[in-house]
């Protein structure tokens, strides 16, 4: 992505923060969900259920959160399962794109799919059920975000809960402190907030 606007703001000593987009070369604090922690929790949960053919369906890895998810997934799959070339599909964060890419994951033998967003999870479930398969009877699915109503689906979606209120309030507080500071100096810092795995009805034992 183009970093010029960030450097221009820093040169003008205009305080700013970033959210879920950390870049070491950007002189500003970033407030992010611990994507790696969330992916690790998701893989560990599926591994405990007996899954070894686990796939990741995420966004394009030029986007920072998607890259962090893919890197963490590759690492934890190697550590827990010994799979050093795991199944990863990159696509857009849309229902339609996820639905289309789910076919490739199933063709490669995935019995569980971790997605980069709840919307992607819904797209994956749509494809799975359209093929006459069940969630979680045949395929387990995990989302990421824990957006509104995910607990009211059938099955309710197992997902990674992002602590959005904490992230936003901390980012706003930091920004106002910088605006009040008479000696403001643009400085990079990372503030990582731990997500939580919310286990619901879309994950089950491998068969």
PLM segments and residue spans:
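Hinge/beta->alpha junction and helix N-cap segments in small-molecule ligand-binding domains
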Residues: 21, 31-41, 56-101, 114-122, ...
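Alpha-helical recognition/docking segments in bacterial nutrient-uptake
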Residues: 1-44, 48, 105-108
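Short polybasic/polar patches that bind polyanions
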Residues: 47, 78, 84, 129-131
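A conserved helix-loop-strand patch within extracytoplasmic ligand-binding domains
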Residues: 46-54, 113
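Short acidic capping loops at alpha-helix termini that bridge into adjacent secondary structure
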Residues: 52-54, 83-86, 133-141
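Short glycine-/acidic-enriched loop or helix-start segments at secondary-structure transitions
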Residues: 3-7, 27-28, 47, 66-67, ...
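Glycosyltransferases and closely related glycan-assembly transferases
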Residues: 7-14, 74-75, 124-133
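Flexible loop/turn connectors
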Residues: 104-207
